[in-house]
């Protein structure tokens, strides 16, 4: 890690903001209402700049631009699939050119450590866009041997105008994961970026213009969920909506889609993912990975390993070592290369997490370390570990989205399966064991869209991610991620004579 850190270029800790308006038709606009909102540096609580506050009227303008770009005969609809791939590769090249700037801007607006922004987030952004660039001319239909004198085949056609609503925890990465499959398959996009972290997505919007995407293909509207987000979800001329965020808002989006034009919906929502430490696990590795599973990204991961189930005969040792690791975690200025943990994204999240810590103490969980603010200013929270957590406690059931680890004890594999699955969520799960039979059994028994064995938070552009139950609908990334962005059309032609 130290060697990798040395390879990271020094950041500008005060990166200039070039774009803070609404991006429609490859042009920058103020909000129709002229309203703005502040975006804040979570390390200091200070305002970085004002950003145009998009609302229903701005979404309407963006949808009109997108619909015009999607008309039959338009440059985008007439473009060869291979050229769509070329544009995505060009976009990735431009992001790579500006990688140092974008990583610094992400850290300024989001608070995540700059080294992570540069090495993890930006790396995955590039891989994701290039992966989908490769799919552009390879995701196609089939010819079908239908009975009779007919020729039948399928076409994979773009869905059309895609509303995409992205969260604040991985702004650049979530933007790439949604733009990649949508643009590779020929769709047009109206994207609503999180009000907490709009700056990097707006910069990338300008790069889509520089890359050569035609006007109206990519439109980006900063704004709030109840206004701009709701306008997208309920819009009669949006063909599909994709949302990443809380399960609570996911409900609202699915309802709005149903009440309007029954647009297609994909949702990647919350989680309370179980991380199961079997007694035969490699203890050094399990402790470090369980720490990473929960504390990575300030605990602000939908798939965080937020219920750490530890088999009883290694429970005491695991707890002791996990507390020591949490106490050694370096919290501080995210631009410092030694920092492991920056601030929570904003004051709302900061207070929410502290509220969950209070609840854990009140309900009888054992606070083993942390438990409070970690600085006099900014939204920093101490790495916190609770032991003796019971399944019925609020901190064991609800998504905290912060640096708060819950450790629970279990006896048997059968018992832990039932407890792990006793959740409204089903996003991810993990198992640490050297026993292949236990790993295999648990990978099948756990109700989760992703199961990691002897690892955690391993993502690839090639592997799909999504949830069971109330963790969402559909999958993102991988070949599976293309399905939500295409309509399958069957074409059948009468022929004089069919031969094999």
From Swiss-Prot:
<dbReference type="InterPro" id="IPR016163">
    <property type="entry name" value="Ald_DH_C"/>
</dbReference>
<dbReference type="GO" id="GO:1905627">
    <property type="term" value="P:regulation of serotonin biosynthetic process"/>
</dbReference>
<feature type="modified residue" description="N6-acetyllysine">
    <location>
        <position position="56"/>
    </location>
</feature>
<dbReference type="Pfam" id="PF00171">
    <property type="entry name" value="Aldedh"/>
</dbReference>
<comment type="subunit">
    <text>Homotetramer.</text>
</comment>
<feature type="modified residue" description="N6-acetyllysine">
    <location>
        <position position="35"/>
    </location>
</feature>
<dbReference type="GO" id="GO:0006068">
    <property type="term" value="P:ethanol catabolic process"/>
</dbReference>
<protein>
    <recommendedName>
        <fullName>Aldehyde dehydrogenase, mitochondrial</fullName>
        <ecNumber>1.2.1.3</ecNumber>
    </recommendedName>
</protein>
<comment type="pathway">
    <text>Alcohol metabolism; ethanol degradation; acetate from ethanol: step 2/2.</text>
</comment>
<dbReference type="InterPro" id="IPR016161">
    <property type="entry name" value="Ald_DH/histidinol_DH"/>
</dbReference>
<dbReference type="GO" id="GO:0008957">
    <property type="term" value="F:phenylacetaldehyde dehydrogenase (NAD+) activity"/>
</dbReference>
<comment type="similarity">
    <text>Belongs to the aldehyde dehydrogenase family.</text>
</comment>
<dbReference type="GO" id="GO:0106435">
    <property type="term" value="F:carboxylesterase activity"/>
</dbReference>
<dbReference type="GO" id="GO:1903179">
    <property type="term" value="P:regulation of dopamine biosynthetic process"/>
</dbReference>
<dbReference type="GO" id="GO:0005759">
    <property type="term" value="C:mitochondrial matrix"/>
</dbReference>
<feature type="modified residue" description="N6-acetyllysine">
    <location>
        <position position="142"/>
    </location>
</feature>
<feature type="modified residue" description="N6-acetyllysine">
    <location>
        <position position="366"/>
    </location>
</feature>
<dbReference type="GO" id="GO:0018937">
    <property type="term" value="P:nitroglycerin metabolic process"/>
</dbReference>
<keyword id="KW-0560">Oxidoreductase</keyword>
<keyword id="KW-0832">Ubl conjugation</keyword>
<dbReference type="GO" id="GO:0046185">
    <property type="term" value="P:aldehyde catabolic process"/>
</dbReference>
<dbReference type="InterPro" id="IPR016160">
    <property type="entry name" value="Ald_DH_CS_CYS"/>
</dbReference>
<dbReference type="InterPro" id="IPR016162">
    <property type="entry name" value="Ald_DH_N"/>
</dbReference>
<dbReference type="InterPro" id="IPR029510">
    <property type="entry name" value="Ald_DH_CS_GLU"/>
</dbReference>
<feature type="modified residue" description="N6-acetyllysine">
    <location>
        <position position="409"/>
    </location>
</feature>
<feature type="active site" description="Proton acceptor">
    <location>
        <position position="268"/>
    </location>
</feature>
<feature type="modified residue" description="N6-acetyllysine">
    <location>
        <position position="358"/>
    </location>
</feature>
<feature type="modified residue" description="N6-acetyllysine">
    <location>
        <position position="411"/>
    </location>
</feature>
<feature type="modified residue" description="N6-acetyllysine">
    <location>
        <position position="434"/>
    </location>
</feature>
<dbReference type="InterPro" id="IPR015590">
    <property type="entry name" value="Aldehyde_DH_dom"/>
</dbReference>
<dbReference type="GO" id="GO:0005739">
    <property type="term" value="C:mitochondrion"/>
</dbReference>
<dbReference type="GO" id="GO:0051287">
    <property type="term" value="F:NAD binding"/>
</dbReference>
<keyword id="KW-0520">NAD</keyword>
<feature type="active site" description="Nucleophile">
    <location>
        <position position="302"/>
    </location>
</feature>
<dbReference type="GO" id="GO:0004029">
    <property type="term" value="F:aldehyde dehydrogenase (NAD+) activity"/>
</dbReference>
<feature type="binding site">
    <location>
        <begin position="245"/>
        <end position="250"/>
    </location>
    <ligand>
        <name>NAD(+)</name>
    </ligand>
</feature>
<keyword id="KW-0007">Acetylation</keyword>
<comment type="function">
    <text>Required for clearance of cellular formaldehyde, a cytotoxic and carcinogenic metabolite that induces DNA damage.</text>
</comment>
<feature type="modified residue" description="N6-acetyllysine">
    <location>
        <position position="424"/>
    </location>
</feature>
<feature type="site" description="Transition state stabilizer">
    <location>
        <position position="169"/>
    </location>
</feature>
<keyword id="KW-0496">Mitochondrion</keyword>
């Amino acid at each position: 890690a130290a060697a990798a850190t040395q390879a990271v270029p020094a950041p500008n800790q005060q990166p200039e903001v070039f774009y803070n308006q609404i991006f429609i038709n490859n042009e920058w606009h103020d909000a129709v209402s002229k309203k703005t909102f502040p975006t804040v540096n979570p390390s200091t609580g200070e305002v970085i700049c004002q950003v145009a506050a998009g609302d229903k009227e701005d979404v309407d303008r963006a949808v009109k631009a997108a619909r015009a770009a999607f008309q039959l005969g338009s440059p985008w609809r007439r473009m060869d699939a291979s050229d769509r791939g070329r544009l995505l590769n060009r976009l990735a090249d431009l992001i790579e050119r500006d990688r140092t700037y974008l990583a610094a801007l992400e850290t300024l607006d989001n608070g995540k450590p700059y080294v992570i922004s540069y090495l993890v987030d930006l790396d995955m952004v590039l891989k994701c866009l290039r992966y989908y660039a490769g799919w552009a001319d390879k995701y196609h239909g089939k010819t079908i041997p239908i009975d009779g004198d007919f020729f039948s085949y399928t076409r994979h056609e773009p869905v059309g105008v895609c509303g995409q609503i992205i969260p604040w925890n991985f702004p650049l990465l979530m933007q790439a994961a949604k733009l990649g499959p949508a643009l590779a398959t020929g769709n047009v996009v109206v994207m609503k970026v999180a009000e907490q972290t709009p700056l990097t997505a707006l910069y990338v919007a300008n790069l889509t213009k520089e890359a050569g995407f035609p006007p109206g293909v990519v439109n980006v509207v900063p704004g709030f969920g109840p206004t701009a987000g709701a306008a997208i979800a309920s819009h009669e001329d949006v063909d599909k909506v994709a949302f990443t965020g809380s399960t609570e808002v996911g409900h609202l989006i699915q309802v709005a889609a149903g009440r309007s034009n029954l647009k297609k919906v994909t949702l990647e929502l919350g989680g309370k993912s179980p991380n199961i430490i079997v007694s035969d696990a490699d203890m050094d590795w399990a402790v470090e990975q369980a720490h990473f599973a929960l504390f990575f990204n300030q605990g602000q991961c939908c798939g965080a390993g937020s219920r750490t189930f530890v088999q009883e005969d290694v429970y005491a040792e695991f707890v002791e070592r996990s507390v020591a690791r949490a106490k050694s975690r370096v919290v501080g200025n995210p631009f410092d290369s030694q920092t492991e943990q920056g601030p929570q994204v904003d004051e709302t999240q900061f207070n929410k997490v502290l509220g969950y810590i209070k609840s854990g103490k009140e309900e009888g969980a054992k606070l083993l370390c942390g438990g409070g603010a970690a600085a006099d200013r900014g939204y920093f929270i101490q790495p916190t570990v609770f032991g003796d957590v019971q399944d019925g406690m609020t901190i064991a059931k609800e998504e905290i989205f912060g640096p708060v680890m819950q450790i629970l004890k279990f006896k048997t594999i059968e018992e832990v399966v039932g407890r792990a699955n006793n959740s409204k969520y089903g996003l991810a799960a993990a198992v640490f064991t050297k026993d292949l039979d236990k790993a295999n059994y648990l990978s099948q028994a756990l109700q989760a869209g992703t199961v990691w064995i002897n690892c955690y938070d391993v993502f690839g552009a090639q592997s799909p991610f999504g949830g069971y139950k109330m963790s969402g609908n559909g999958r993102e990334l991988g070949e599976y991620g293309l399905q939500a962005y295409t309509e399958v059309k069957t074409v059948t032609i009468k022929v004089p004579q069919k031969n094999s």
